[in-house]
Amino acid sequence: MECNREDAIKAKELGESYFKQQNYTKSLSLFTKSKRLYPTDGIDQLISKAEAFLNNSNSNSNNNNSSNNNNNGNSGNKSYTPSSTTTTATTATSTLEYTKEQFEISKRVLDSKTHYEKLSLLVNCTDVDIKRQYRALAKLLHPDKNKAPHAQQAFQEIKVANDILSDAIQRKRYDVQHRIHQKPQTNRYQQQHQQQQQQPFYNNFTYTAETAYAQAHSHQRQQQQQQQQQQQYQEEFKRRQAAVRAAQQQQYQQQQQQQQQQQQQQQQQQQKRSTFVEVKCINSPNCPPIVVSQVVYDCYNRGDVSILCNSCSKESTYVKCKSCQSIYHLDDKFKSVSHDLTCQMPSCKRSVSVGFPNLIYDVKLKNTFMRGSKAPETTPPVTGRIPRPKFPPATTRQKQSTQPQQPIFNQPQQQPIHTQQQSQQQQQQQQQQQQQQQQQQSQQQTDFSPQKSQSQTSQKSQTSQTSQTSQKSQKSQKSQKSQKSPLKFGTQSEILISDDEDEIESSKTPLQTQAQQPYVVISPDQTPYTQSKTQTQTQPTPNHTPSSQSTNYTSPNQTPLTPSQYSSSSDIAHDIDIAMANAEKEALKRVSDEALAREAERNPVNHQKIIEAMRREQEKLKEEIERLKEFTRQRDFERQLEFERQKEIEHQKEIERQKEIERLKEENRLKEIEHQREIHRQKELEIQREIELQKEIERINQEEKKRKQYEQELLSKQIELEKEKERQLEKEIELGRERLIRGEKNFQKQFEQQDKLQNQSQKNNSSSFKNSLKQQQKQQSNPTISDDEIEPDIYPPLPKLAAFSKPVDLSEVQTKNPQSSITSFMVKKSDEKKDSPTPGSKFSSSSSSFSSSSSSSSSSSSILQPSLPTKPTIIRNNNSPSKHQHKEIKKDNIKPNINNNNNNNNNNNNNNNNNNNNNNNNNNNNNNNNNNNNNNNNNNNSNSNNNQLNVETNLSFDFEEEEFEFYTKPSNKKVENQFSDDTIFESSVFVETIDTSIKTKQQHQQQQQQQQQQQQQQQQQQQQQQKLQSQQTKGTKSSTPEIEKEYSSSPPHPNISSSEDEEYDGSWYSQSSTQSKELPQTTSSTNTIPEYIPTTVKMDDIVGNDFDNVANDYSCGYDDDDYFNDYSSHFIQQQNQINLMEMEKEKQKEKEKRNGFEREIEKERSAQIEIELEKEKEKEKQRQKGKENNILKSNNGNVNNGNNNNNNNNNNNNNNNNNNNNNNNNNNNNNNNNKNNDKNNYNQIRTTTPIKTSANPLKNRNGHSNGNGNNNNNNNNNMNHDHIHSFDESEGERDEGSEDESLGILQSINIQKVSKKRVLSVSGKSERKSKKSHTVYHQNNKISDY
């Protein structure tokens, strides 16, 4: 097939390479494969060569084996035994390789001539038979099963036969080529075929491998030669057929062309004869236009004829330049010019001959003349006037213009008058002669013979006389015509050629012996030819018209034609008959003249003799006439045979031409087919290339998509890591806020106690101190649960509100029952900016509100003493009315929060004194510093035992359009707070104190056991989930931290109400806490929100993954107060240690996961990580700069961790005054206190529950530390509100130098609302688009823009 040509060429080239390497078996297989694909040139020779070399190699190997065996036999017995074993092994293997049946089947396939015989099928077989037979033979002849020689070739032959016969088109073509007709086979052939199948070889000769191979090879060669001969014969036959068809077609085309040419010539001649053209004379402008026929006009334009004008009798002609084909019109003056002229074209400039043509057309005579030829001698000179042309004059033309007038050449030519009269006379004479002959015959029958002879002689004489008279009359008439027809003579005699045929000379007889010179006759009605004395000229018939004759104008230099070139057989026979008739007439005339002369001389006696002599002469004449007739017949017959022979030759030539044409057409058709196949193949290649290009483009696009997806995944992972860090910070902040609330509760209780103590001191100063001691002892005797034991994550996180860093105005709270009342407040944004109060007067006394900040500049070290108002007042912003209302929160959902605090009565007394005497406080504080510092160790050691019961505040937030509303339960009055900046804060704090009822110890132990079981189950589930996640992340190389899952799966607080005002039924609370029951309600009154709380637990020691588990451990409620008295601290320590160990393990796992993830990112995107590292370096530099700036800006530079005593806080407050000595003392005291705080931190970690906080979660920019402190610590924090800085919320950028500080974390807040659960999240970016700078307040009364 044509499509497999390239593969065949490749196989051929590979076979040649293996042939050069002397690997003949492989080369032979490749050659056969290439031939099967497409029979290329020279493939058969290569196959035969490879087979020959393979046979030689096999024979050489056999000879070598035989020689080796002989040598081994002669060497001795020892060497003979292994050789015999080898020979037997080889023979055994050779015998076992193939059987006789296998060899016979392969030989039968190779010996078969047709594909039908190869498959042992009939010609009329079906496709099913072909497939069945092919499968059966393929199993027998497959090279893996049949090891006989040439089995592989036989298998290939079967395969080729199956491919051809299974395809219907190829099968038909094969049948046509090999002339296989599907006819029913004879019984004899079938019997032979069956015998061959049963017994393929009749003789009992055993074939060896070599003989079988040689026979098969010779048979194959013979078969190939036969096929080649058949192909050559078919090709030759096709070529001959094509040549015959081409010759026939060419002959047919030539005949059609000749016919078309003849028709065109006739049409042109008719058009030329029927048209006339007017020509202007260039010799004189006064000459009228010359009317000329189309033929003459064409000759005139070509330059073959010059026209002689009628009026001026001057010539004009056209001359052409041979080089540039430019035409020049010459007048009569150029006759005298002898030299040539130059061409006037600028590109030519060659000489142009000025010679006039040899032919002249006379307008008057309307005839053409030959210049330079002699006139005949018989022509007399011209005398008289030249007759006018046949055209009517111009005057008569105008009159006769209306009448149609035919051209002259189209009118039938009439005989002249004298010829008509002559013909009438001849007819009359003939009639008279006939009458006389009839009379003579009648007389001869009655008279004697002499009378008959006389009558005959008289009759002959009369006929001779009439013939002579007729000839004389014709000559006289012609002479008169010749006198009438004028001749023009110039320097040389010119012959006149007339249009009328009657004027041609015909007086001379064909038997005239006078010598005549040949002359050229040129006329529009006759073809030119030369006349000689042997040639005859016939007169035209009267009815012959010039229109029917051929008009061929030729130049004078053209050679004349012979009669054989222009006359046919019929014309020659007619001429011969005329010549014979003339001869008879002449003979009769001669005989009659002689007889008359004799009769005059002799006597009439001898009349009989004369008659006999006349008879003899007549007989001779008859014989001669018959001889001439016979001669003419023979000549006609020979000519007819010659004509037929020529026709046959022409017919054969036409056939050959048609064959050649058909051959050429066939070649062209084959070329076109090959060209179309080539185009189709190129198109297929182009389509394949396009498909490959599309696949490549798709692959590239997929790779790009994968790369982009991978980059996006990496970016998303980085973003997730950043989010996780932010979430951890947020959780830390939330814990800090909760501790703030707890500290605020402690502060409120202490504040109430201080009020009671002040009232008692006024009544009885001596008894007040003792009463306070008794109260403290009672509180110590009733131990409470520590704050760290309760899970902080049960309650929702508080947003990073600026309320914790800014002053709050609270309205007077009206309480009917201090144990059951609920106080609430709201913080709202003011639409209009209001004047910010001075640092010393943020909360005025006229509004009856207590402030959490320090007092004015005059009394900077005083402690705030809020007074409880009797009547509530509401501060409302009219510009921002409230839109939403909060529903009441059920008391069942409120949980107690138990905090550990250190109570020091001495510190309280000092604080009270500081409020009264501002000036004396400096000295008192200095004196008390040493005393209080000595008591630090004792106070710190008693932290674990001194427990105080406080109630945790339940917070809920709602926001929409930067506004918030809340209602107090008993009074239903709204309270607002005003801020100096434009930040949005919406918060509602519902503080409700509950008298907790504690259950028995046994119930708590049962609950604790169940909780431990649940923890173990949860840990197992978490481990299983981690394994599944690690298996999933192996393919994708992406790991999501567990912190995000646990944080995202944490349920909302049950007290938070949805935006659709739906009450929360506490389902999550009941599910998360095992065996939780409704808690008894206890009430207490709180009036303030604390700014910060001190912390002692570091984030590095606690892992956030176990935070929820810890929360579940301590989410149950308690009913009995006696339980806490007997609660052992040892059990708590063990439980905490176990939790810490588990947390540390999970922390290590998280670190390992993060490290592995970071390594993958570093490997895959090293370039991006380097850029990020550079950015981080720049950020670290900026952080260092920010820290330095913060240290400079802060008024105090002392930072303390852990439990800070009252002395530390008082010292910090005294730093604001101008006391240099105090600052030195404070620094020393702080250093001592730091050591004690470290010890307290260690003790608290052992005795308290782990809380997820940072080392310094809520550190102020002024340097004051936050943590679990005493009551006075909270007061000091409230005093330090004037030193709080506010930042630009629109930018939302965290100060990188103060990540560990509280206000650096609490820069800006973004509260997000999530459907009904209303999860509150804190982020470091604000949604506000406006950039606003906020003022910074200091105690030195300086205002600066940050």
Swiss-Prot record:
Biased composition (Basic and acidic residues): 746-755, 1173-1190
Keyword Coiled coil among UniProt keywords: yes
Record domain J: where: 114-178
Region (Disordered): 57-92, 214-239, 371-570, 746-949, 1026-1090, 1173-1301, 1319-1346
Keywords recorded for this protein, A-Z: Coiled coil
Molecular function terms, GO-annotated: Hsp70 protein binding
Compositional bias segments (type: Polar residues): 508-517, 552-566, 812-824, 863-882, 1068-1089, 1244-1259, 1336-1346
Coiled-coil positions: 214-275, 577-742, 999-1034, 1131-1194
Any Gene Ontology CC annotation: endoplasmic reticulum membrane
GO biological process: cellular response to misfolded protein; chaperone cofactor-dependent protein refolding
Biased composition (Acidic residues): 1289-1301
Biased composition (Low complexity): 221-234, 403-485, 526-551, 756-782, 843-862, 899-947, 1195-1243, 1263-1279
Annotated InterPro entries: DnaJ_domain, DnaJ_domain_CS, DnaJ_subfamily_B/C, J_dom_sf, TPR_rpt
Protein name: J domain-containing protein DDB_G0295729
Organism encoding this protein: Dictyostelium discoideum
